């Protein structure tokens, strides 16, 4: 960020560039052979493999700290200044509104050509252009030499090589051109030798074209021509750039007509710091690049008379002579400069180089060539753009450009690293040059500020917010003029320093290396957009930076002494860091500030579109830096932006308003000025300047451009030396450059103040600093006392300085440093003494141990003893602590020496005590090694003591033990202690022997596994048992074979195997008689398949045959029992019903379609829960008993539900005329269209209907079922289930027939007959013998049913069978057209509970304890998958089965609360609660 004075300026045309033909030829010089190396290629790695510098610190001020920018910057300065550039992230509540209308904001950006700004590239291009310029205007025909391969010779590289060999003169004298050629040519061409033609080519071209140019430069450097220097400095002053825009246009009073000058064309600029006033050019001067009308001979005789010359007798050419030989002879060889107004002439033989003939083209004298040379390269890389943009259109352009460049759809897809790498590649790219646009240096007074300003008219809904931020201290329009900013004493704004500039950036737009004007601070705020990347060098390293750049580009730095004050040169930070320059980076996001410190070189670029604003400010600590900057500017003859001394005296004038900090700094500077003025007066006296030659002048009333030293360009304020005759002015220091033709007597000394005036000002200002001086004297005395002061007293002085707002002087910082150092040491000591923080944890994977050691503690004690404050108390504590540490170390050393006498626990306790000290103790590491050795010994003994036990195979963990593989043992051996003892050596030997033995047995196991046999398994295992600790492939296979065989035996006899014998054949012969389920047989078969010995054996085939027989039996039974539209599997059909309890409770139990292929595992899966026939018999009898108790409750629940008991759950609404059927067993009512006809119903009286729950199967004839059992294994439990059902059917049929006969004879009641009939109807096998009696009793007992639903039954019978049965019945998810919550889906009431019973054989029914806990007067003892309970909430808190109370779940859930009958008897008032117990 650069600066300009806020003054009037006008738009100006583009700056004149160097002549086009040299630039065109220069481009040829760039197309050299790819094989020819250069300095650029030497530095290539830094550009193509860019490494980002380390990041500078980021600061996050609190809201309180953020309230005062100057104070906060002063607070962080001592830490941050060394980085040059730092970032400040404001508090989250700092959100200034953007005050610019993006559509109305218009600007014309500058175009930046990235490959023209880099220092190394620029140096080469400049050299080539200057060389062409010199040869062209010197009258030489210049062409680029070409080698034999057609490659253009790189003249810049050739020049550098010759210079490295000592220069042209030395190369010529020592005949080193072959060496030069050898250095120039690439290695692959050197194989063919160095061509003599090439040597002659480069020698002749160098001597003819390059050496005269170099000689001209040396002669110019040796000259001490002040007039010429003025001319050069003036020209460069015109072309000072900020991002390529003109820095200033200051006109120095002309003492003479500049030779070789021209009309000054002002450079295009956004705004100017100063404007030249009343500038007049010589009327006789022509435009640069035009030539006078002369004939080809350039003879004096042919020179036309000047226009308007009335003297016909005098030829103007008589005044022309050769400036080299001062003679006018040989007029036909006397050349005259083509620049109008320049009368310099030179003979062809006086030229350097000598011309053989009069050149046909343009010729200029050396002075005019030098003038043209000074312009070359000043404006490279920065050009005026043709298009004007507003913020919206530039945003669109910038984002599209970035997306197109990186080939993405959105700018957010491009990583930050990719942009940075591409930028540094582009600055050296010749093949694909990149140009971008940058809206830089846009003055806010003209285009507007991104911050609201006090003078703006604020409107809109955010009016108050704008007014708030218009006065905010961090508003960049306010920062330069804050009370503690030195710049606040200026009466007028300085553009870029006091008046902010704004910058509209895009991807790759760059700002080159520079420092701020007058080395002030700068602050930059990114209003919105993508990041701005900064690189910074601290002010203390500025000279390192300058030296590095001189090394990188000596041609540029040697040519421009003030190169570092321009903003047109880029240099790679990675390269600079390799040369020892400390550079750090800052990544500035939107909404963040960046601060640059005095003399901090900084540069950077933009990652994409953004809008930033910047301004300078100058805290009081800047004053001394500003003075140093003026001296630096003087050395390079750079113009000032303002007079530093003048600013200081503006502060002196306002001394009554200065704070103590500013008063002190101003007083110190004023004393320096006073002493300097005294010294200058003494110098003048020695020079002979008398008092009569002295004059008091008010310099501030003289325009800046009229009071600058003609030599160093410093704006003068305190004093000046003036030549009365020629009106020239210098500072006193440069009196010898004032005038070459006058003496001291012709000088006049002008001064601003008398010495007495300065002395009085010092006294007056000193009075304002009395309190500080007293504070300083007292603090000095305190530090110089014999006894050291206590830390508390030092803090009192610091607090006093803070309260009185004393400046951050060296004394204050000294006290703060003492306090900080002391507190830091105290904190370290306290961490050791009080164990507040454990800095290293006990983890296996440790980071680097950064803790101190005992030497570090002793060093800390010594540091505390040497400090400038008294820390005796803490030092004494630390010394006593060290004594304890030494005592511990002695104990630790004893434990290490006699480790055998210490247990592992004792050593661990010593380590734990040592860890508590939290310092590095080498004894801890030694103790840990002892622990490691003991741990290793324990691990090794675990292996060596692992012995096989007689019954180890019976251990339930036998299969899952963690054993050791060969690699584990080898690893254990490798981990053995490096310094073994006798004990560890013995363990290593044992491990090695065990491993050898185990590997031998592994071979035996391998042989067995190749030909496994069951009769050999026992003997093989006996030989392998001792390797129980070993885990290898073939021993594992034998071990697992043992385990599988044991499991198979266990499955067969349900006993824990004793593996000393294997009598499997006997067991397998019994398997057909063993009680076993089909699923268990399949499990045994699977186990056989995993056994190497039994898979495919005779025994295995026998089991497979049994399974095949059972599967065939299942198929036969399924054909007999399962209808096509079955909703029950075989077990559910053949077993007693277990769904009665939930049905009695009113629950909905869905049935799912069971049709399709018969899978035995699906048909008998409930059989997995039974392990014996006794369990099945007990289970079936229990269900039968429960059916007798509960079935009446089921009928009651179904009757109450009506059609909700239908398989559609009552959702299939119908007319009252629709036919329904009622099951004669369970009283559930069904729509006819919801029912399916069963052939069994044809055997019953017409109108008789059994529902799908009561008629689960096809009711096959008992003889068919008996036949199906033929050939089945006697021990298969599934066959027992069928046999039991056959036996039950016979008994029920016998009971039915006997009851019917006895009823006829009067010996039996109707109730007994009804029970017998119910049993017969519920039996799933049909015994035809009982059918007549059953039909007779049905017709009699259910006559009403039969008459009522005979037509409905006929309708069902005649209805065609559905082609596609329903997927499920009684399923609310399927049948409901609109979802209605069912009882089973309601949230269980707080007064009810459900006790789940797992369906294991022993827990399938309720325990007696459960029955006893039900307090119903007649408990029905229900059981099943779920039984619901309800609790009395009246006071007794007793529990009851819901079914035992006669309620359904819906009724229970609808109750407010349930009260039992006992509690109701004691109630005093009626209640709505229900009780039926």
UniProtKB/Swiss-Prot annotation:
Official protein name in the record: Lysine-specific demethylase rbr-2
InterPro entries the UniProt entry points to: ARID_dom (IPR001606), ARID_dom_sf (IPR036431), JmjC_dom (IPR003347), JmjN (IPR003349), KDM5_C-hel (IPR048615), Lys_sp_deMease-like_dom (IPR013637), Znf_C5HC2 (IPR004198), Znf_FYVE_PHD (IPR011011)
Catalytic activity line of the entry: N(6),N(6),N(6)-trimethyl-L-lysyl(4)-[histone H3] + 3 2-oxoglutarate + 3 O2 = L-lysyl(4)-[histone H3] + 3 formaldehyde + 3 succinate + 3 CO2
GO cellular component: chromatin; nucleus
Location in the cell: Nucleus
Cofactor(s) for this UniProt protein: Fe(2+)
Basic residues: bias regions: 272-283, 295-304
Coiled-coil stretches noted in the UniProt entry, renumbered to this chain: 874-926
Boundaries of every JmjN domain copy: 56-97
Free-text cofactor note: Binds 1 Fe(2+) ion per subunit.
Ranges annotated as biased composition (Basic and acidic residues): 246-259
Binding residue positions for Fe cation: 514, 517, 602
Biased amino acid composition, Low complexity: 9-21
Disruption phenotype: RNAi-mediated knockdown decreases lifespan in wild type worms with an intact germline. Results in extended lifespan when egg production is inhibited by the addition of floxuridine (FUDR) or in a glp-1 mutant background which lacks a germline.
Any one Gene Ontology molecular-function term assigned to this protein's record: zinc ion binding
A biological process term (GO) from this entry: determination of adult lifespan
Disulfide bonds: none
Top EC category: oxidoreductase
């Amino acid at each position: 960020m650069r600066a300009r004075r806020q003054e009037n300026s006008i738009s100006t045309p583009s700056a004149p560039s160097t002549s086009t033909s040299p630039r065109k030829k220069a481009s040829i010089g760039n197309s050299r052979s790819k094989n020819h190396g250069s300095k650029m290629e030497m530095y290539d790695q830094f550009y193509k493999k860019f490494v980002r510098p380390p990041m500078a610190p980021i600061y996050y001020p609190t809201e309180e700290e953020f309230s005062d920018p100057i104070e906060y910057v002063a607070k962080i300065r001592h830490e941050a200044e060394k980085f040059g550039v730092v970032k400040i992230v404001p508090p989250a509540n700092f959100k200034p509104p953007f005050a610019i209308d993006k559509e109305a904001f218009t600007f014309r950006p500058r175009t930046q050509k990235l490959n023209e700004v880099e220092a190394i590239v620029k140096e080469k291009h400049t050299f080539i252009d200057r060389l062409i310029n010199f040869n062209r205007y010197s009258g030489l025909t210049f062409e680029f030499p070409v080698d034999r391969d057609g490659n253009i010779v790189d003249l810049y590289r050739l020049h550098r090589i010759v210079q490295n060999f000592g220069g042209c003169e030395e190369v010529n004298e020592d005949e080193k051109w072959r060496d030069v050629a050898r250095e120039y040519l690439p290695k692959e061409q050197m194989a063919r030798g160095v061509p003599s033609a090439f040597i002659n080519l480069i020698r002749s071209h160098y001597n003819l074209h390059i050496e005269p140019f170099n000689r001209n430069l040396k002669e110019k450097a040796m000259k001490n021509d002040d007039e010429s220097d003025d001319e050069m400095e003036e020209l460069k002053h015109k072309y000072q750039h900020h991002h390529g825009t003109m820095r200033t246009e200051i006109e120095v009073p002309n003492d003479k007509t500049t030779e070789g000058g021209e009309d000054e064309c002002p450079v295009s600029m956004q705004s100017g710091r100063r404007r030249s006033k009343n500038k007049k050019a010589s009327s006789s001067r022509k435009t640069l690049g035009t030539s006078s009308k002369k004939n080809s001979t350039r003879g004096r005789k042919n020179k036309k008379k000047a226009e308007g010359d009335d003297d016909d007798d005098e030829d103007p050419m008589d005044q022309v002579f050769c400036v080299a030989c001062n003679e006018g002879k040989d007029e036909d060889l006397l050349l005259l400069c083509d620049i109008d107004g320049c009368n310099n002439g030179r003979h062809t033989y006086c030229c350097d180089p000598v011309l053989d003939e009069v050149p046909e083209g343009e010729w200029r004298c050396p002075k005019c060539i030098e003038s043209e040379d000074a312009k070359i390269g000043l404006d490279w890389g920065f050009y005026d753009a043709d298009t004007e943009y507003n913020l919206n259109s530039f945003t669109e352009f910038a984002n599209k450009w970035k997306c197109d460049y990186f080939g993405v759809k959105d700018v957010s897809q491009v990583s930050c690293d990719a942009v940075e790498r591409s930028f540094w590649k582009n600055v050296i790219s010749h093949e694909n040059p990149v140009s971008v646009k940058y809206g830089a240096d846009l003055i806010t007074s003209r285009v507007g500020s991104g911050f609201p300003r006090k003078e703006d008219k604020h409107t809109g809904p955010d009016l108050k917010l704008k007014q708030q931020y218009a006065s905010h201290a961090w508003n960049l329009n306010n920062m330069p003029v804050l009370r503690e900013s030195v710049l606040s004493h200026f009466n007028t704004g300085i553009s870029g320093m006091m008046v902010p500039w704004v910058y509209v950036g895009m991807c790759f737009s760059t700002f080159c290396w520079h420092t701020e004007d007058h080395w002030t601070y700068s602050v930059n705020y990114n209003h919105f957009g993508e990041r701005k990347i900064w690189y910074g060098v601290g002010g203390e390293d500025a000279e390192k930076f300058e030296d590095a750049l001189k090394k990188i580009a000596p041609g540029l730095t040697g040519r421009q002494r003030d190169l570092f004050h321009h903003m047109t040169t880029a240099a790679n930070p990675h390269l600079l860091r390799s040369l020892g320059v400390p550079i750090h980076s800052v990544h500035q996001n939107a909404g963040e500030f960046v601060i640059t410190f005095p003399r901090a070189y900084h540069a950077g670029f933009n990652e994409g579109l953004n809008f930033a604003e910047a301004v300078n400010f100058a805290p009081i600590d800047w004053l001394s830096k500003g003075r140093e900057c003026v001296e630096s500017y003087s050395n390079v003859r750079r113009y000032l932006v303002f007079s530093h001394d003048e600013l200081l005296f503006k502060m002196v004038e306002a001394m009554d308003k200065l704070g103590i900090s500013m008063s002190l700094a101003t007083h110190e500077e004023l004393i320096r000025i006073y002493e300097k003025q005294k010294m200058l007066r003494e110098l003048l006296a020695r020079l002979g300047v008398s008092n009569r030659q002295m004059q008091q002048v008010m310099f501030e009333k003289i325009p800046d451009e009229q009071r600058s030293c003609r030599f160093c360009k410093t704006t003068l304020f305190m004093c000046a030396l003036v030549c009365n005759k020629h009106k020239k002015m210098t500072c006193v220091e440069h009196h010898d450059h004032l005038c070459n033709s006058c003496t001291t007597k012709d000088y006049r000394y002008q001064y601003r103040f008398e010495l007495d005036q300065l002395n009085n000002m010092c006294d007056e200002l000193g009075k304002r600093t009395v309190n500080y001086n007293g504070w300083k004297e007292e603090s000095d005395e305190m530090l110089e006392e014999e006894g050291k002061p206590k830390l508390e007293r030092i803090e009192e002085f610091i607090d006093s300085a803070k309260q009185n707002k004393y400046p951050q002087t060296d004394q204050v910082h000294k006290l703060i440093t003492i306090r900080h150092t002391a507190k830091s040491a105290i904190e370290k000591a306290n961490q050791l003494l009080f164990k507040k923080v454990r800095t290293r944890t006990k983890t296996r994977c440790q980071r680097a141990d950064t803790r101190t050691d005992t030497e570090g503690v002793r060093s800390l004690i010594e540091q505390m003893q040497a400090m400038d404050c008294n820390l005796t108390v803490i030092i004494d504590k630390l010394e006593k602590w060290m004594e304890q540490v030494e005592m511990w170390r002695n104990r630790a050393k004893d434990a290490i020496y006699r480790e055998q006498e210490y247990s592992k626990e004792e050593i661990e306790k010593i380590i734990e005590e040592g860890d508590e000290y939290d310092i590095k103790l080498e004894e801890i590491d030694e103790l840990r090694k002892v622990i490691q050795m003991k741990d290793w010994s324990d691990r090794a003994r675990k292996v060596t003591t692992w012995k096989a036990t007689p019954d180890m195979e019976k251990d339930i963990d036998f299969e899952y033990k963690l054993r050791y593989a060969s690699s584990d043992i080898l690893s254990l051996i490798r981990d053995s202690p490096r310094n073994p003892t006798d004990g560890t050596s013995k363990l290593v030997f044992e491990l090695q022997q065990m491993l050898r033995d185990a590997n031998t047995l592994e071979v035996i196991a391998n042989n067995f596994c190749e030909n496994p046999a069951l009769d050999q398994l026992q003997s093989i295992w006996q030989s392998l048992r001792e390797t129980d600790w070993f885990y290898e492939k073939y021993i594992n296979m034998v071990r697992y074979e043992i385990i599988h065989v044991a499991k198979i035996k266990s499955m067969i006899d349900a006993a824990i195997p004793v593996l000393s014998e294997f009598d499997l054949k006997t067991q397998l012969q019994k398997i057909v008689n063993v009680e076993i389920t089909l699923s268990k047989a399949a499990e045994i078969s699977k186990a056989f398949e995993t056994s190497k010995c039994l898979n495919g054996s005779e025994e295995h085939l026998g089991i497979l045959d049994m399974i095949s027989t059972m599967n065939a039996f299942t198929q036969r039974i399924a054909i007999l029992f399962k209808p096509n539209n079955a909703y029950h599997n075989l077990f559910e059909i053949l077993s007693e019903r277990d769904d009665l309890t939930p049905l009695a409770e009113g629950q909905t139990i869905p049935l799912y379609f069971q049709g399709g292929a018969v899978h035995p595992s699906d048909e008998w899966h409930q059989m997995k829960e039974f392990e014996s026939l006794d369990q099945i018999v007990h289970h079936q009898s229990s269900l039968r008993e429960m059916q007798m108790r509960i079935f009446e409750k089921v009928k009651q629940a179904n009757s109450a539900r009506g059609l909700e008991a239908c398989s559609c759950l009552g959702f299939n609404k119908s007319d009252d005329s629709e036919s329904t059927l009622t099951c004669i067993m369970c009283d559930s009512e069904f729509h006819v269209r919801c029912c399916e006809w069963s052939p069994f119903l044809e055997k019953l009286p017409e109108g008789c209907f059994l529902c799908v729950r009561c008629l689960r199967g096809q009711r096959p004839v008992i003889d068919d079922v008996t036949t199906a059992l033929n050939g089945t294994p006697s021990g298969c439990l599934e066959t027992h289930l069928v046999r039991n059902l056959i036996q039950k059917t016979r008994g029920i049929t016998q009971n039915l027939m006997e009851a019917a006969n006895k009823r006829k004879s009067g010996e039996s009641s109707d109730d007994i007959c009804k029970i017998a009939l119910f049993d017969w109807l519920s039996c799933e096998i049909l015994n035809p013998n009982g059918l007549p009696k059953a039909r007779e009793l049905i017709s009699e007992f259910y006559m009403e049913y039969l008459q009522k639903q005979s037509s409905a039954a006929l309708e069902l019978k005649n209805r065609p069978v559905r082609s596609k049965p329903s997927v499920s019945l009684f399923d609310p998810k399927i049948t409901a057209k609109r979802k209605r919550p069912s009882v089973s889906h309601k949230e269980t009431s707080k007064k009810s509970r459900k006790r789940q019973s797992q369906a294991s054989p022993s827990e399938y029914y309720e325990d007696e304890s459960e029955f006893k806990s039900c307090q119903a007067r007649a408990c029905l003892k229900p059981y099943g998958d779920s039984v619901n309970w309800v609790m009395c909430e009246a006071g007794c808190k007793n529990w009851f089965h819901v079914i035992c109370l006669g309620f359904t779940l819906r009724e229970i859930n609808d109750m407010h609360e349930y009260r039992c009958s006992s509690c109701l008897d004691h109630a005093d008032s009626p209640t709505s609660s229900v009780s039926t117990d």
